[in-house]
Amino acid sequence: IDAGQLVLNALIAFHDDFEEHVKNHRCLGCMEDAIPCVAKCPAGVDIPGYVALVNEGHYADAVKLIRKDNPFPVSCAYICEHPCEQRCRRNMVDGAINIRGLKRFAVDQAGDVEQPACAEATGKTVAVVGGGPSGLTAAYYLALMGHKVTVYDMHKKLGGMMRYGIPSYRYPREKLDEEIASILSLGIEAHTEVKIGVDITFQELKQKFDAVYVAIGAHTDKKVGIEGEDAKGVVSAVEMLGNIGDGNMPDFTGKRVAVIGGGNVAMDCTRSAVRLGAEFVTCVYRRRQEDMTAQAEEVEGAIAEGAEMLTLHAPLKIEADENGNVAALWAQPQIIGEIDKAGRPRPNTASVDPLRIPADVVIVAIGQGIESNLFEADGLKTKRGGTIIAEDSTKVPSLDGVF
């Protein structure tokens, strides 16, 4: 019985991995590839190839090689989390080579690199819903294949989370604009501030185009689910970073800011609040600092800039004053417990009184959701969390030409 339960637990915890093995006969977590760093790269970029080209001083060729698998070499040179370095063979000697740094050096030295020529026109048309990394990547390679591509996005500008989720201090907007313009130069048509279901229906897209690729991203916020979350001064990370992406900078001058969360988005909000004039910024996280999902360099950067990391404290409630404005965030101290499925100690409530954290602004940065409900009425099925169900990772079941 115990053995059977272990198998069941594994099937539940690693459902996607088992499904990938059964359906596609491959292992996404396999580290036995001939080139481990390439195996860890989500885009499968030829890392040894472009590193060798950088070594030879062929910077433009290095950029061209990266583009074979990833049309955003500049973006990744600035903001990639570089998982490839975890599997760099140099770790067996002393430490990984600075792969992302070499990519950054290549794109800086290469300057403007001409895009490859598109294949002969096929006469096929494709609509891409969403102008973020996924949508623009699909548009790029479809255009190279000779298809006519049109991108629709609900925001003022293209870029998705690269623009509306990552602050400009990490990725300068002029660099993002240049890279997007380079992609569009392949003849890709783009329409911004177009919302599907309002300005144009999904059915109209299906009728107008030979294929539709849905790449809507995760642009809705998630609630903490605590008392007082509707107080004035409580903002979501999605809202705050989205406003910053549009150039609408909030004024935190002299204010006390509390950020809830421990991921990269929480660090982006924390460090942005410091830059926006906050008098004091506290990042409240229910686990230990070493359990944060944010990159260590981002956490260390936030601390170096004067932010406080209040760990092992779970948000309990938000206190509002008589006018309904945020006055404080209450947090319950935690102690570490058993290891969870992700390999991190599970936080448990400590037998001590809650802590009151004075605050004028509370930023909720605990993840994003997917606004896929607009597509469900048109036959796109979703699973928990709003993720669209697809076959072979892309094709939408029972809808021809929809991916």
Regions of interest found by a model, annotated:
Residues 230-255, 339-403:
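FAD-site-proximal beta/loop scaffold in flavoenzymes
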